Design a protein with these regions (language model features):
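Residues at or immediately preceding the N-termini of alpha-helices
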Residues: 190, 250-253
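Conserved acidic donor-binding segment of nucleotide-sugar-dependent glycosyltransferases
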Residues: 244-250
Length: 286
């Protein structure tokens, strides 16, 4: 939900949060800014990129805004150290290996990745919304408040903005399959949205501008199971050992849920190591 969907008092509160949380992160929860904070160097804009090209030869772990990553291929990396590239904080999808600078880096952790190979290219979570935005990334709203067995078995759908046709397709199916899906209409305050999500075992997470969504990770932090359309991106998350459901289309959700519920309940968020920033610090050697 964008800030424009809220009332004037709510927008004022969001602005106050933005001032309060400027340059803050939601550690130990994952977010783009949180992952950037554990890197040696951060490239957030064109001037950062130019400074990196001119002067930096020592940073081992580099965070770059995803849509700027293709420009790194233009840099001469002669005598540079063995580097790891962390790419995020953008809706940019990585769909071809030619988009990343193989000459300057030996390993890559990419958000919105369709090209991960689990060898030197890995998919990185986008995590929750950055705390500095002041809306949906507030740690107090990411708690588990209902146990698994007390939740609805329907799939929560929405509210969300129409940023991709997949969302329209989901709504069309959900309107017909009312025994499987529950459409939630907005706008909702961040607190009310969190309370609503805690009432469901399963959360539909259709893609938006990028393949990954904050809703996917919000669902996991609140003890729910995200449902996504199967893709190279969703398949590449398997190394993170997370509970999720992949379907070929949204009409399959009902049968997929039945198969999932025949298994043991999912692990609680506290036991999912890859949801937390310390896991990534250790993995990356920060």
């Amino acid at each position: 939900m964008s800030k424009g969907t809220f009332s004037i008092p709510a927008r004022l509160l969001i602005r106050l949060r933005q001032l309060r949380y400027h340059n803050s992160i939601s550690s130990p929860f994952l977010s783009g800014d949180g992952l950037a904070s554990i890197c040696d160097l951060v490239i957030n804009n064109q001037s950062d990129l130019e400074a990196f090209a001119r002067h930096d030869r020592n940073s081992r772990i580099v965070f770059c805004r995803s849509d700027l990553v293709p420009e790194l291929s233009r840099i001469d990396f002669v005598s540079s150290p063995r580097r790891t590239l962390i790419a995020g904080n953008s809706d940019y999808d990585f769909t071809a290996s030619s988009q990343i600078p193989h000459d300057g880096f030996e390993s890559f952790h990419l958000q919105n990745s369709f090209i991960s190979n689990d060898e030197n290219i890995f998919t990185l979570p986008i995590g929750i919304e950055n705390l500095s935005i002041g809306i949906n990334g507030l740690p107090n709203n990411l708690k588990v408040t209902k146990d698994w067995n007390s939740r609805s078995t329907k799939v929560m759908v929405g509210p969300f903005s129409p940023t991709h046709t997949e969302r329209k397709e989901l709504l069309e199916v959900a309107e017909q399959e009312t025994k499987v899906f529950k459409i939630i209409k907005g706008p909702l305050s961040p607190k009310r949205f969190a309370q609503e999500m805690n009432g469901y075992k399963f959360i539909a997470c259709p893609r938006g501008n990028g393949i990954d969504t904050h809703r996917f990770w919000e669902a996991l932090y609140r003890g729910s199971v995200p449902i996504v359309i199967a893709s190279k991106w969703s398949n590449s998350l398997k190394y993170l050992d997370l509970p999720l459901i992949e379907v070929s289309n949204w009409a399959e959700a009902g049968n997929a849920i039945k198969e999932f519920t025949d298994q043991s309940p999912p692990k609680p968020p506290s036991e999912l190591k890859s949801l937390w920033l310390p896991f990534w610090k250790e993995l990356l050697g920060c």
